[in-house]
């Protein structure tokens, strides 16, 4: 093994911000046997908005043609593994425990409403969700503050001579 890392679920984390937050949540739920912890900052939980997208937006990433090139047929995204809510419902129905979730979003972020909705959805399913809101928008000032909170939330060995790690790195 080139890197002596733990392969245990409880030692494996995934995180992202904005569209990467969506990706971390989606992949963390899809690969729930791999990831024990998921963190999403200002996550782009905008699948409902995609169903009504057209090509009139000045922002390329909001255009229907762009979204279809990434996600495929937008009329089908609510009932497939692209949708984190669908994945979570499927896990719940099968009795699969959820990874621990940390979600945070700025009070001035346009993604605040969908993040609150996803938090509520996961709480209703009984997931272990740590959720925070604070001053800021969809910007690095917010993410820089909250990534530190993510690191504090994760089960890391903060006193190791090897630096911040899971405590499962063998040198």
Predicted segment positions?
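Non-catalytic cap/lid and distal C-terminal segments of serine-dependent acyl enzymes
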Residues: 1-171
